[in-house]
Amino acid sequence: MDENKKRALAAALSQIEKQFGKGSVMRMGDRVIEAVEVIPTGSLMLDIALGTGGLPKGRVVEIYGPESSGKTTLTLQAIAQCQKLGGTAAFIDAEHALDPVYAAKLGVNVDDLLLSQPDTGEQALEIADMLVRSSSVDIVVIDSVAALTPKAEIEGEMGDQLPGLQARLMSQALRKLTGNIKRSNTLVVFINQLRMKIGVMMPGQSPEVTTGGNALKFYASVRLDIRRIGAIKKGDEIIGNQTKIKVVKNKLAPPFKQVVTEILYGEGISREGELIDMGVEAKLVEKAGAWYSYGDERIGQGKDNARTYLRDNPQVAVRLEAELREKFQPAEAPREAGDDEEKE
């Protein structure tokens, strides 16, 4: 660059800093790129699939799937992990359906959890924005986008047609929220539901669509698709769901990874079940017929007994988890990958 251009650029940068503050514009080479801060999800498999060890702070995350697939369970376990690390968590319950007894079973300290049950979508998003701007909350969960009902719809008649109202509300809120989320380093998780598109579909195109328009798809750094794929039985009794979680979008690591984990009723994601499955995959746990062995010790006949053994011997589970993390998890979080999408 010639001297005249350099002087003009220096003058422009100086003017920008005077008007908007130091750091408004910077050279990428001058900025130290730090590893992304994360909040673990409570699922070792998912933490590894995300590539960064958890859900990234200072970002928007969307978790969507069919009913009873484990969306709220996953977010409550992330809240429990955040609280264990000394963080503050908020849950905006637009569905008015949070069960504090179940949350406590998943490890959430319900006495310290900030809970809001707003009347309208505008109120819910305004509360979320105020909590984010306080810079004192580590994770804010909004359950769910479908329940963020615009004020005009609540005040109107039952049959009123108000097309695009919720999509406009989400688009406006996310434009306002994203800058504050980055500055305050808060993780904001939106839980979303699925609907079916009505009309003729192109071959190979999915008829499923998430609620609340397209804005959230663009603003989210991570999108997780969670689905129940089978039942876990103990004899004839169903004790949980086999669940597939797919990383549909990831701006911080390679996307499209998927994991199959177990969600047990009243317990949440089975940590011991994940350790056994990953141990077998990594050849740290040996499976001979129905028997599972770790090291020189047999830990159980059948997965259920092996799971019980690890639960009763936490020191063995901790040792196995440490070995698995060393084998599967990258030494450091990767730098942020480029993103081709443009925000609308």
From Swiss-Prot:
GO terms for molecular function: ATP binding; ATP hydrolysis activity; ATP-dependent DNA damage sensor activity; damaged DNA binding; single-stranded DNA binding. Disulfide bonds: none annotated. One of its GO terms (biological process) is DNA repair. ATP binds at residues 65-72. It is found in: Cytoplasm. Pfam families: RecA, RecA_C. InterPro entries: AAA+_ATPase (IPR003593), DNA_recomb/repair_RecA (IPR013765), DNA_recomb/repair_RecA_CS (IPR020584), P-loop_NTPase (IPR027417), RecA-like_C (IPR049261), RecA-like_N (IPR049428), RecA_ATP-bd (IPR020588), RecA_C_sf (IPR023400). GO terms for cellular component: cytosol. Keywords: ATP-binding, Cytoplasm, DNA damage, DNA recombination, DNA repair, DNA-binding, Nucleotide-binding, SOS response. SMART domains: AAA (SM00382). HAMAP family: RecA. Belongs to the RecA family. Can catalyze the hydrolysis of ATP in the presence of single-stranded DNA, the ATP-dependent uptake of single-stranded DNA by duplex DNA, and the ATP-dependent hybridization of homologous single-stranded DNAs. It interacts with LexA causing its activation and leading to its autocatalytic cleavage. This is Protein RecA. It comes from Xanthomonas oryzae pv. oryzae (strain KACC10331 / KXO85).
